[in-house]
Structures are given as C-alpha cells and as structure tokens.
Regions:
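Short, contiguous alpha-helical
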Residues: 1-49, 53, 88, 95-96, ...
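Acidic/histidine-rich alpha-helical segments that form the ligand environment
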Residues: 46-102
Length: 149
C-alpha cells in the first residue's frame, strides 16, 4: 500500500538517523571549540528544509528517497529500540553542540552530500522530521483503534 504503518514511520526515521547522526558526530569532532557560541542563526536553505518538514494541520505528502522508504521491509519491535537509542544519541549530540558555533559548523544533507547546511539547521531538520512522522504513526494507531471500536 501507499501509506506506512506505525512501525514503517519509525523505521523511516531510523534510516534518516543512520545518515545524520554519524554526520553530526563527524562535524562536531572537526569543529573548533567555541566557548561563547552565542545565538544560532538559521541559513536560508536550512530554514527552508526545516520549515518544510514541520508537521502541519493538513500534512503535505512528500516523496521519500527509495533508500529511506521502509515500505515492505520485514520489521519488528526492534525498530523501536533502535529509534529510542537514536533519540538518546541525538540528545547527547545536542548537548555536545553547546560548545561549538552551530551557525558555522556545516553538515552534509541526504539530498546531496555537497549540499551542506549549518549544524543548528540540521538539528531542526532531524527533530522536525521526527515530529512529523511520530504524529503520522500516532494517526495510524488512532485510526486502527477507531476501526476496532
């Protein structure tokens, strides 16, 4: 089918996490410590990407990259453990990012490795994308519960 089930929504997020979390890690390792990091400033491209992923009342469907499409993959509850582990890793990376200038540190995107946006925007992209698909998974579950009632 065209729509994902709840586990597929979460697996989709782990597939993105598999790309972004190591890239954020690499960028943080290369970054110069910056004690007075100041206020993060969004870039125009990063801001565009992040805002396009924000959950909206009427969700705008987006085409996903084939390698990030979980449709038809054999999935079980280990997907949830992997996702939770990635969430802990994201919190750790966010904490470590306090010591660098998130406006200057650049991270490659899944669109193309040469398209790099700043670290602060990458965090926004990852977090908004997670919110979007967690809400999608919740809607799928709510729909199933209505059908069973």
């Amino acid at each position: 089918s065209d729509s994902w089930n709840a586990l597929e929504c979460i697996e989709h997020l782990t597939l993105y996490g598999d790309f972004y979390l190591p890239e954020i890690e690499k960028s943080l390792k290369k970054a110069t410590p910056y004690p007075a990091a100041g206020t993060f400033k969004s870039g125009w491209l990063g801001n565009y990407f992040a805002k396009s992923l924000l959950p909206k009342e009427k969700l705008n469907k987006m085409k996903t990259f084939r390698d990030k499409d979980p449709n038809g993959l054999p999935l079980d509850k280990s997907v949830l453990s992997r996702f939770l582990q990635q969430q802990k890793q994201t919190l750790d990376l966010l904490n470590r990012a306090r010591t660098v200038n998130m406006t200057q540190v650049r991270v490659p995107t899944t669109i193309a490795r040469w398209i790099r946006i700043n670290l602060g925007d990458i965090f926004r992209v990852v977090i908004y994308h997670n919110q979007r698909h967690i809400l999608q998974a919740q809607r799928v579950i709510a729909h199933l519960q209505k059908q069973e009632a």
